[in-house]
């Protein structure tokens, strides 16, 4: 029987954990930003792709900052870890040497850049977004858990 600490030393274990953590947050992200906005119900009324810009995300940060930061931090960190682990696995299969320290450094850098971009979106809040558009955007959020259980 292998302890969790011994399993954690295996580089592939981290990639599997990151992939497992990525599934629910990626599903929430896709539902809120792609699937739900296509609905033809009021007040969403099929948000067009031109209306699904960064203001869609920034309104979410303005209304639910704790949840949004949790989801987007998980998305960035788990996504970067999963991508870097998968890249190393592919490189090993092709017979290339991999240096895990460089992979970890690159993953941290990638996650940091993604979070910096997320911070830039979040700091603007709902500035410049009309109240009607904010209501349409929040209707999208209210269709998806965890936002569906909150009052907004």
Regions found by a protein language model. Give the residues of each.
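Membrane-embedded alpha-helical bundles that constitute the cytochrome b-like, heme-associated redox core
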Residues: 1-152
């Amino acid at each position: 029987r292998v302890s969790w600490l011994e399993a954690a030393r295996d580089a592939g274990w981290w990639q599997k954990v990151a992939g497992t953590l990525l599934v629910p947050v990626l599903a929430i992200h896709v539902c809120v930003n792609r699937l739900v906005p296509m609905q033809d119900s009021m007040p969403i009324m099929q948000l067009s792709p031109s209306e699904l810009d960064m203001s869609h995300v920034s309104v979410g940060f303005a209304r639910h900052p704790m949840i949004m930061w949790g989801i987007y931090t998980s998305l960035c960190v788990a996504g970067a870890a999963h991508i870097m682990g998968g890249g190393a696995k592919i490189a090993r299969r092709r017979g290339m040497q991999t240096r895990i320290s460089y992979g970890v450094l690159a993953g941290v850098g990638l996650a940091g850049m993604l979070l910096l971009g997320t911070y830039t979106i979040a700091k603007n809040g709902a500035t410049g977004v009309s109240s009607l558009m904010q209501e349409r955007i929040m209707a999208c959020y209210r269709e998806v858990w965890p936002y569906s259980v909150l009052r907004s």
